[in-house]
């Protein structure tokens, strides 16, 4: 496709004097008394718009160019020249401007104002990509997702597309969205008066997936190194800045790997992604550092250069209890660490990313490998300065008898997990993996604190518009 991007002009891919055509939207128009207009046109390929210097000698100057407002779409052709102004190296001496689309009423155009609160923009999810902040988030999100695929490809992993509709609860928490084609006004009932799901589309109770992990484990048991990258769903009625009902997860699974192996993999992956975004999206990161969080670039560079610390959960609890800091949530062995505990460990105690390992079994999922002490499981969380938990993982329970005992402990049906149990009956192997909440990663990189602002169309309680 031979469409010229604004980014390619700024990268110097066209020699001075070249004729180029850019296509995009007007960010602003400024007119001078000398009969020249300056159009700032962006196409989303980079943070900055390109400036077009438009002479009044153009045929449509008075009828169209002087009527252009923010949001109008244009096709602008001109000669690449050095820019005498600050902020960009090149601009266009324009020879033609074709208006592709007008803004119907500039006075009511929601994006006309120079600044909107980020909360207000959530009500305009269809238009908010046109703003500086959401456009920058989208480019960073793209850069990170491409880096993740590159990393796993270079490491010899195979990408597996796991199903979005499932009959299994990978977390055992029960917070799942039901998928059904039954008539809600006339539900079929069995002899016990319960809904008869045998008459439903799938012939049994089905849900949107909370994780692709269990399915990925089956492929790791044949292909050794696999990963999933796709949407997951949680029907958790939490209306907070850290929760979404629909979000994306990255979940690698590795056969013959133990917990330390995947802790190392997590460190490699995060550093690879952060290096990529620092290199590819410096313009957007500089915007975030200026307008959102001044520490974003320093934080990423520090992360990349830091060695990860490691600590057992039991030792972490002792560190927290003896640190002298008063926490909102008291610390004792057996609790699930809260964000304030995680951030203290990463930001104040270790002053580096930290892997917390070997959690109490009672606060973790059934599939995590039981340690020899019978009280803890081979689970880990990766904690990052500035956000807390960013990755959760575990060595999986490969012993059928222990897995069955855990299912029984948690009142889960062995029959529901018959296929998962089969993997322990036919050539079982030690294997491990982790899950990375992709939106949490984007939030960490951009400094945008509300997770609803780092996904294009957020889904949350009472919020499913667009």
UniProtKB/Swiss-Prot annotation:
Reactions catalysed: tRNA(Asn) + L-asparagine + ATP = L-asparaginyl-tRNA(Asn) + AMP + diphosphate + H(+)
An individual GO BP term: asparaginyl-tRNA aminoacylation
Keywords for this protein: Aminoacyl-tRNA synthetase, ATP-binding, Cytoplasm, Ligase, Nucleotide-binding, Protein biosynthesis
Leading EC class: ligase
PANTHER family: ASPARAGINE--TRNA LIGASE, MITOCHONDRIAL-RELATED, ASPARTYL/LYSYL-TRNA SYNTHETASE
Assembly notes: Homodimer.
Name the record gives this protein: Asparagine--tRNA ligase
Annotated source species: Shewanella sediminis (strain HAW-EB3)
Gene name for this UniProt entry: asnS
């Amino acid at each position: 496709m031979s469409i010229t991007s604004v980014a390619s002009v700024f990268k110097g891919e066209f020699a001075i004097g070249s004729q180029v055509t850019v296509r995009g939207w007007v960010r602003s128009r400024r007119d001078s008394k000398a009969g020249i207009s300056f159009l700032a046109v962006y196409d989303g390929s980079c943070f900055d718009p390109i400036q077009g210097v438009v002479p009044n000698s153009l045929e449509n100057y008075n009828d169209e160019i002087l009527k252009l407002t923010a949001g109008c779409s244009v096709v602008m052709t001109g000669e690449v020249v050095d820019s005498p102004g600050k902020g960009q190296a090149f601009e266009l001496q324009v020879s033609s401007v074709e208006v592709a689309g007008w803004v119907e009423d500039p006075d009511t155009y929601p994006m006309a104002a120079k600044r909107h609160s980020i909360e207000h923009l959530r009500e305009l999810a269809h238009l908010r990509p046109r703003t500086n902040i959401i456009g920058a988030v989208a480019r960073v999100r793209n850069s990170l997702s491409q880096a993740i695929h590159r990393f796993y490809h270079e490491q010899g992993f195979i990408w597996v597309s796991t199903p979005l509709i499932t009959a299994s609860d990978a977390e055992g928490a029960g917070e799942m969205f039901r998928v059904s084609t039954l008539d809600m006004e006339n539900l079929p009932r069995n002899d016990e008066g319960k809904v008869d799901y045998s008459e439903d589309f799938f012939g049994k109770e089905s849900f949107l997936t909370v994780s692709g992990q269990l399915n990925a484990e089956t492929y790791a048991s044949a292909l050794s190194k696999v990963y999933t990258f796709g949407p997951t769903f949680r029907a958790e009625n939490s209306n907070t800045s850290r929760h979404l009902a629909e979000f994306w997860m990255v979940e690698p699974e590795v056969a013959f790997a133990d917990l330390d192996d995947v802790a190392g993999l997590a460190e490699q992956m995060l550093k690879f992604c952060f290096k990529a975004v620092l290199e590819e999206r410096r313009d957007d990161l500089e915007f975030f550092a200026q307008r959102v969080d001044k520490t974003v670039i320093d934080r990423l560079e520090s992360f990349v250069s830091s060695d990860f610390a490691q600590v057992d959960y039991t030792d972490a609890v002792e560190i927290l209890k003896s640190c002298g800091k008063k926490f909102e949530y008291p610390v004792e062995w057996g609790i699930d660490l809260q964000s304030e505990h995680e951030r203290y460990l990463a930001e104040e105690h270790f002053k580096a990313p930290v892997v917390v390992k070997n959690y109490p079994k009672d606060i973790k999922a059934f599939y995590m490998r039981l340690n020899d002490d019978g009280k803890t499981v081979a689970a880990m969380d990766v904690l990052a300065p500035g956000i807390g938990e960013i990755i959760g993982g575990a060595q999986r329970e490969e012993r059928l008898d222990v897995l069955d005992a855990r299912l029984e402990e948690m009142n889960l049906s062995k029959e529901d997990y018959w296929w998962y149990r089969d993997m322990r009956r036919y050539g079982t192997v030690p294997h491990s993996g982790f899950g990375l909440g992709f939106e949490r990663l984007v939030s960490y990189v951009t400094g945008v604190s509300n997770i609803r602002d780092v996904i294009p169309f957020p889904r949350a309680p009472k919020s499913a518009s667009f």
